Amino acid sequence: MSKVRKNEEALSEVLVDVNRVTKVVKGGRRFAFSAYVVVGDKAGRVGAGHGKAKEVNEAREKAKQAAKKKMMKVSLYQNRTIHHDVIGRSGAAKVVLRRAKAGTGVIAGGSMRAIFDSLGVHDIVAKSIGSTNVYTMIAATFDALKKLSSPKSIAARRDKKMNEIFIKSSDIQVNE
């Protein structure tokens, strides 16, 4: 039984990195290309993939297929930002993602911006700390996105209702 994905043509594709790689053999050097692609539907689904081939277009296509296989769903707050602040790590890379007010825009550098644009995030503040290698930054960003949870999923995990999760300001007691 094969999986058929709807809206496959509606996916946005961003080529994040292209690199020429070399294999040294007895007769000389063999050149190939490596590509890293981020795909998303701009509605909460995003994936990243890596591909290698003799030609750039073939490498890009392989990377796109790999990214489609690795797509994940991310719950967004009001379809514009994340639910809470989160930190992601991968190797020497560390990223801090913070939710932002409406109208803030995407404040993120490099490959993180490609992920947020493909994801459909309109307001977010992201900071990269440590390594700025494309591969590790994307892996750290995906690590952070995996750590996100919506209030609905938290309520389900705790066997509580949604209104029990949120604290009312009138219920907070201040000790003087």
From Swiss-Prot:
Top-level taxon of the source organism: Bacteria
Free-text function comment from the UniProt entry:
With S4 and S12 plays an important role in translational accuracy. Located at the back of the 30S subunit body where it stabilizes the conformation of the head with respect to the body.
Q: What is this protein called?
A: Small ribosomal subunit protein uS5
Q: Name one GO cellular component term.
A: small ribosomal subunit
Q: Which HAMAP family does its entry note? A: Ribosomal_uS5_B
Cysteines paired by S-S bonds: none
Segments forming a coiled coil: none
The domain-related comment in the record is: The N-terminal domain interacts with the head of the 30S subunit; the C-terminal domain interacts with the body and contacts protein S4. The interaction surface between S4 and S5 is involved in control of translational fidelity.
GO biological process entries: translation
A Pfam family name for this chain?
Ribosomal_S5
Which Gene Ontology MF annotations are present? rRNA binding; structural constituent of ribosome
Keywords noted in UniProt:
Ribonucleoprotein, Ribosomal protein, RNA-binding, rRNA-binding
Q: Which residues form the S5 DRBM domain?
A: 11-74
Keyword DNA-binding listed: no
**Sequence similarity:** Belongs to the universal ribosomal protein uS5 family.
Oligomeric form and interacting partners:
Part of the 30S ribosomal subunit. Contacts proteins S4 and S8.
